[in-house]
Structures are given as structure tokens and as C-alpha cells.
Amino acid sequence: MAITGTDRVKRGMAEMQKGGVIMDVVNAEQAKIAEAAGAVAVMALERVPADIRAAGGVARMADPTVIEEVMKAVSIPVMAKARIGHYVEARVLEALGVDYIDESEVLTPADEEFHIDKRQFTVPFVCGCRDLGEASRRIAEGASMLRTKGEPGTGNIVEAVRHMRKVNAQIRKVVSMSEDELVTEAKNLGAPVEVLREIKRLGRLPVVNFAAGGIATPADAALMMHLGADGVFVGSGIFKSENPEKYARAIVEATAHYEDYELIAHLSKGLGSAMRGIDVASLLPEQRMQERGW
């Protein structure tokens, strides 16, 4: 395996994004706005999650032409999404030269039984999780970066908060366990015990964990950092707002200075309307993207 395919290198690449904001973009123009605002990376896709949710049907990997246009337009890392379990979409993205692949529940799953074996790839993967069981399974498969699933395309932060709090609470529990308790907890979580042992030894996840799913305002981003996120993904929140350029800059600043409440108050002034949100409680079970994956 090439040196760039090792866990150490791939996880190190993800560590370099800590404290930053990664923004969804659908074309080169949006990618330039994101880079100018201070995004540490962009996620190239055909439609933002809000539009995927509204359109329904099957959501797939973006057209390679769109991804290549975004890659040519910016100097920051470019990520792209593959469907859960779709090995070939992931190989296509790797062949295009993207910097990260997101095996994403935002797209329609291709496999309802298996995720991609990410250790076969040189390019690092990011995956979503709702709890430590999901996080540990994705790490065992080779994920180099995690993010909360939240509820994408809603502009509602409540599920991202729930997922971040749950993962962190379960980490604290694991750290305090004895070896025999750890084995039982691995069974309860459906998690590989080797991953839980590494979490116990480190006192944290062995990979970075960003917040994602419903972040729409500078205050939302700061809240997720306050709860322990290593950084923030913003999907629909930027380009579904009234003023994408202002929102992008404000969210980047709020993420970097999440404990400076006077600054966040200043950043929040005169931004215009945030994206229109959806009450997650109103969604039918089949409309909840966070349920995808296992």
C-alpha cells in the first residue's frame, strides 16, 4: 500500500482541518465564495441537502465534470460524496483526485447491508455517526474523519446536538471502564472492542469528529464547537441563506472564535434571513436521512 494510504497519514490529513468550516458547493462560483470566506475545504455535489430532500428520488454521486470544475477553481481541499456501499462511485472519485470521500447518508444508499471497506483506498474517507457504536464501526472500516449525521437539509441543529452529546457521553463512559466491562460494552454498542480499547487509551476518538446536519447560523456553529466538535460542515445553510457571502464569513469566524460571544453577536447582525428550517419532528421515518447506514 502507498504511504499515503496508511491510517496515520490519512488521519493526519483530517487533523489539518481542525477548527475550520467545510462548505457544500454545487459549482465553481460557490467554491470560490467558500474559499474567499475562509473555508478549510469544500464538498462538491450536484445539489445541497435541502434540494435533495425537496426533490426526492434517487440522489447519486455528482457529475465528475462538476467535481473537476470545483477542483480547478480553488486551492483548498475538495471533498465529494459517494453513496453508502457504492464501491465504484468511491473508486471514480479517487480516480478524479479528490482529497476526501464522504460515504454519505445524504445520498441514496446503494447497499443496505455493507459500507465501503475504506482501507482499500489511498484517499481518506469521512463518515457520519449518531453514536459511539456507529463511530467505532466506521473507524474499524477505515474512516479517517467523522461527523455527526444531524438531520441534513433541515436548518435545524437539534439532531446534530443530540448526536454530538451522545458520542461524547459514551466516550466518557468507555474511558472509565475496566477491561471486562469494555468487552461487554463493545457487544452492547455493536462496536469492535479494539476500537474501544484505543478510545479508552486516548481518552477520545482516534479521528477528528466534526459537526454536521442542520447548522444554519454563526451561533449554531459556535454551539457545536462548544459541545466539543473539532470543526463544522455546513451544507444548505450557506447557499440557501439570503446572503451567502456574509453567512459564509460569519460562520467561519464564529467557528474559530466560538467563545467570543461579543464577536458572535457582531457577526450575527445584518446577515439577512437564514435558510428556512424544517421541524425534524414533522418528518416521516422514511424522510429522516440520519437513519441511513448502520
Curated annotation (Swiss-Prot):
Disulfide bonds: none annotated. GO terms for biological process: amino acid metabolic process; pyridoxal phosphate biosynthetic process; pyridoxine biosynthetic process. It catalyses: aldehydo-D-ribose 5-phosphate + D-glyceraldehyde 3-phosphate + L-glutamine = pyridoxal 5'-phosphate + L-glutamate + phosphate + 3 H2O + H(+). Its EC number is 4.3.3.6. Pathway: Cofactor biosynthesis; pyridoxal 5'-phosphate biosynthesis. Keywords: Lyase, Pyridoxal phosphate, Schiff base. Gene3D superfamilies: Aldolase class I. D-ribose 5-phosphate binds at residues 24, 153, 214, 235-236. InterPro entries: Aldolase_TIM (IPR013785), PdxS/SNZ (IPR001852), PdxS/SNZ_N (IPR033755), RibuloseP-bd_barrel (IPR011060). D-glyceraldehyde 3-phosphate binds at residue 165. The active site is at residue 81. It is an enzyme of class 4 (lyase). The keyword Lyase applies. One of its GO terms (molecular function) is pyridoxal 5'-phosphate synthase (glutamine hydrolysing) activity. Belongs to the PdxS/SNZ family. NCBIfam families: PRK04180.1, pyridoxal 5'-phosphate synthase lyase subunit PdxS. Catalyzes the formation of pyridoxal 5'-phosphate from ribose 5-phosphate (RBP), glyceraldehyde 3-phosphate (G3P) and ammonia. The ammonia is provided by the PdxT subunit. Can also use ribulose 5-phosphate and dihydroxyacetone phosphate as substrates, resulting from enzyme-catalyzed isomerization of RBP and G3P, respectively. In the presence of PdxT, forms a dodecamer of heterodimers. This is Pyridoxal 5'-phosphate synthase subunit PdxS. It comes from Geobacillus sp. (strain WCH70). The lineage of its organism: Bacteria, Bacillati, Bacillota, Bacilli, Bacillales.
